[in-house]
């Protein structure tokens, strides 16, 4: 298996992910489990404990227009949500040009 897509309720992917899975397949998580880099903010926002905080720093925000090279090398990809994608792609050219 090369790639695993997860589309689960908040908290479920984080409770299932482990080094064994990541050593065998790239994981693309469609939930928000690995989008927010601050565990305390994640837990406050979703009202649940994050079950895999050790993988948060490794997860790459999967917006290919901005993080293409990082995504290619990543084992764990946090698929961006629709509102952040729209907002980010709208302002990114302005930020990039300063």
Annotate each PLM feature.
Residues 1-98:
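N-terminal Rossmann-like NAD(P) cofactor-binding subdomain of oxidoreductases
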């Amino acid at each position: 298996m090369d790639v695993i897509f997860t589309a689960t309720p908040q908290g479920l992917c984080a409770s299932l992910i482990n080094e064994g899975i990541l050593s065998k397949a790239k994981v693309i998580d469609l939930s928000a489990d690995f989008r927010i880099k601050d565990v305390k903010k994640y837990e406050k926002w979703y009202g649940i404990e994050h079950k895999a905080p050790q993988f948060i720093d490794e997860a790459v925000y999967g917006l290919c227009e901005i993080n293409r090279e990082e995504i290619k090398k990543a084992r764990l990809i946090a698929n961006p949500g629709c509102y952040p994608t729209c907002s980010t792609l709208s302002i990114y050219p302005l930020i990039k040009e300063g």
